[in-house]
């Protein structure tokens, strides 16, 4: 039986593009693990995707995951079928433009093959303590010097 894991993620950027950070909380039973990281020159969307990627990569075995993010970009790409259409259209949008962040989307596809992941949208900067903590982790990571 696969482990059931709950993950919250968030990304932040100081300027867009600019220095960025991501944060994630992984919860399994009573165990909570916090992870974070950043990049010196990036975008907010890359940090949102990186948070999900790093959290899913931290799982040592295939799991059933509920992943919560305040990123419409991430959640809608999965839940609204954008990602499937992009891959079917050789990484072109409906407007025939090249999809941004292909490298990260490919990693997400790889990880969602390994894990059974349900993506959920949460309201950012609201009363969700897990999302708020991930936001704090991401903002702290922005300020860290590599």
UniProtKB/Swiss-Prot annotation:
HAMAP family: RNase_H. GO terms for cellular component: cytoplasm. PROSITE patterns: RNASE_H_1. Its main location: cytoplasm. Endonuclease that specifically degrades the RNA of RNA-DNA hybrids. Monomer. It comes from the Bacteria. One of its GO terms (molecular function) is magnesium ion binding. InterPro entries: RNase_H, RNaseH-like_sf, RNaseH_domain, RNaseH_sf, RNaseHI. This is Ribonuclease H. It is an enzyme of class 3 (hydrolase). Belongs to the RNase H family.
């Amino acid at each position: 039986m696969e482990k059931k894991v709950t993950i919250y993620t968030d990304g932040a950027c100081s300027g867009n593009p600019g220095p960025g950070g991501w944060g994630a909380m992984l919860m399994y039973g009573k165990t909570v693990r916090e992870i974070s990281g950043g990049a010196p020159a990036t975008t907010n969307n890359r940090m949102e995707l990186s948070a999900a990627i790093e959290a899913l990569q931290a799982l040592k075995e295939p799991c059933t995951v509920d992943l919560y993010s305040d990123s419409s970009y991430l959640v809608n790409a999965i839940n609204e079928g954008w990602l499937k259409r992009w891959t079917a259209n050789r990484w072109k949008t409906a407007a025939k433009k090249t999809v941004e962040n292909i490298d990260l989307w490919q990693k997400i596809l790889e990880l969602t093959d390994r894990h059974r992941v349900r993506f959920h949208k949460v309201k950012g900067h609201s009363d969700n303590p897990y999302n708020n903590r991930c936001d704090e982790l991401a903002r702290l990571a922005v300020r860290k010097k590599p």
